[in-house]
């Protein structure tokens, strides 16, 4: 996926989870943060950030904050990007997929993707990962009851004879492995292990990231 007309800035502050104040060429500019997670380890005063012009007519903020430099490591923090890059990658991930259907209603939830195969359905829930420490990627960075619910829906899918995958898009390149963040949300880690034991495929992929683009690159080991 590609962004157009990306500009560079320096993060100053985050008044709330939706906006940030960024220095762009010496001018303080209020920007939209495309990630409502905490991101405390990323958005620190003085951090180098990248922004894409907003395209929605009538919006109040001229830019979306999409990427940040963390100690020399470029991290995409656009919460919409993981689904976009998986949509581009889906047929490489599952070569038997004949149709890629986003936002698929299943049970009491709307899962991110349904891949239609000759032998049935392959349901995929995508999660973006921006939390990293010492090369180890972790999810989530804040408690997510919605994420736990999605894992239970994937278990139900397997019980009904479907294929199911929890797909973690690590929004950076330089990571060695992925694991659930039990310190932040033990229930999510427990649900992920339960899903894996039930037959849900749990995978994580690192990405190639530049200020103006991101694409899925390679699988990384999942530690449960």
Located regions from the model:
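Conserved catalytic cores of phosphodiester-cleaving nucleases, focusing on short active-site segments
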Residues: 9, 86, 111-141, 154
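Short nucleic-acid-contacting surface segments enriched for D/E, G, S/T with interspersed K/R
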Residues: 37-50, 155
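Acidic-basic catalytic patches of nuclease active cores, encompassing PD-(D/E)XK
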Residues: 40, 71-102
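Nucleic-acid nuclease catalytic cores
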Residues: 135-145, 152-184, 206
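Domain-level recognition of nuclease-like catalytic cores that cleave nucleotide substrates
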Residues: 171-224
């Amino acid at each position: 996926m590609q962004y157009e007309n990306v500009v560079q800035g320096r993060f100053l502050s985050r008044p709330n989870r939706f906006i940030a104040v960024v220095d762009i060429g010496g001018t303080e500019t209020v920007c939209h943060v495309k990630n409502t997670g905490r991101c405390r380890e990323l958005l620190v005063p003085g951090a180098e950030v990248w922004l894409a012009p907003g395209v929605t007519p009538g919006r109040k903020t001229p830019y979306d904050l999409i990427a940040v430099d963390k100690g020399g490591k470029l991290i995409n923090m656009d919460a919409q990007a993981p689904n976009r890059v998986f949509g581009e990658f889906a047929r490489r991930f599952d070569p038997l997929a004949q149709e890629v259907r986003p936002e698929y209603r299943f049970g009491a939830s709307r899962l991110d993707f349904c891949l239609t195969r000759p032998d049935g359905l392959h349901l995929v829930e995508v999660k973006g990962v921006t939390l990293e420490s010492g090369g180890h990627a972790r999810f989530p960075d804040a408690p997510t009851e919605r994420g736990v619910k999605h894992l239970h829906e994937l278990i139900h899918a397997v019980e009904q004879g479907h294929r199911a995958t929890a797909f973690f898009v690590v929004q950076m390149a330089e990571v060695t492995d992925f694991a659930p963040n039990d310190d932040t949300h033990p229930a999510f880690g427990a649900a992920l292990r339960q899903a894996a034991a039930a037959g849900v495929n749990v995978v994580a992929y690192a990405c190639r990231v530049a200020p103006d683009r991101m694409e899925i690159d390679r699988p990384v080991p999942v530690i449960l």
